[in-house]
């Protein structure tokens, strides 16, 4: 059934809604109207309001024909099944399955709220609820010519990069909890880029293009330690969640290259870009060093799972040696520094969360405990700043830092101010992950997939930690 519809100015259509009837015919737009938002309106006449319950629904969809250009090949959206399904058939199937789809959605909503509440309380559940859809929606799902799944993110409200590794990394907890195939779909383009010989450097690319064209990195700078650590840690996390290292085995050669890069360059990183370079990039980054150590330790864990005992022993021992050096180099008394060479500085060491969650056990437990105690002295009303340089923070990283010790008291201490931000912010935008901790206003970024990182506490539960 085709419903009455009209394209026109928002003011005209809004006024017509008071009568319940859209104007007949097309609408010519005056100069004043052209300055307004143009909208599409539908009406579904379901009768007058009465005591009897009446329901109706609209189905709204968009056929982008081809979603992504992937290394010179235009790829259809996944739902088209390589052209076997068109938009009309998709609508017909959706209509036929409407009741079942609504039931399944309602069931998942209920389970998400109950499970997240059980793990982290009502406020944590509400944070996860507002993050879930946003984290998934910032991607396009396609396959390559061989049918390999590609789940490509768009770096919203920054530079529009597609398939950015340091966007995949913070979003990963949600997908590790619910569907590792989608996380593999984020990593597959980066593996392909290196393994095909198109990316020749001894560390992963930052991205594979600018959305929606994924023909190779377009970002102006590399993040060598950042992206190497990200890919190795995530490959390890996938193996532990899946219960096997099959995915890592498929990419062992390039993972080995990246692990060896971290052995050489990771302990005391040079002046290079990283994901948190908002206030400028810098050398001797202690949190970036932790990521490198976790990457090396993760490689050792993967080798162990693949029966490569000698390699496992070698890389695990080296990771422990690196961690011991880190503790001495970063020590600043009651906390650990932002950079090895600057006493009196501090930063969130959110990368350390993997040491406990993945069972790597490379760092002394006292490091996380010391950091957590110090964080509690540095919080503002709307959260823990990212480091000592600025008032602003990244809320995804706070939810990681909140899981450093495994203590519920520590988790709540850092999580609740983030809930206060989400609940009280005057910035009425799709959830921003970059905000000021003093007044709760948006600093930048919105509608980004990184809020999947809010699910770190759920991942902790899934891994039995």
Where in this protein do the model-derived segments appear?
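Asp/Glu-centered strand-loop micro-motifs enriched in Gly/Pro and often flanked by an aromatic residue
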Residues: 28-48, 138-164
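Aromatic-rich carbohydrate-recognition surfaces in CAZymes
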Residues: 54, 80-102, 160-269, 285-303
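Well-ordered alpha-helical scaffold segments within catalytic/enzyme domains
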Residues: 61-63, 110-118, 169-181, 230-246, ...
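Aromatic-lined, polymer-binding surfaces characteristic
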Residues: 125-130, 136-144, 163, 196-205, ...
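Non-catalytic carbohydrate-binding regions of carbohydrate-active enzymes
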Residues: 252-276, 280, 307-349, 358-465
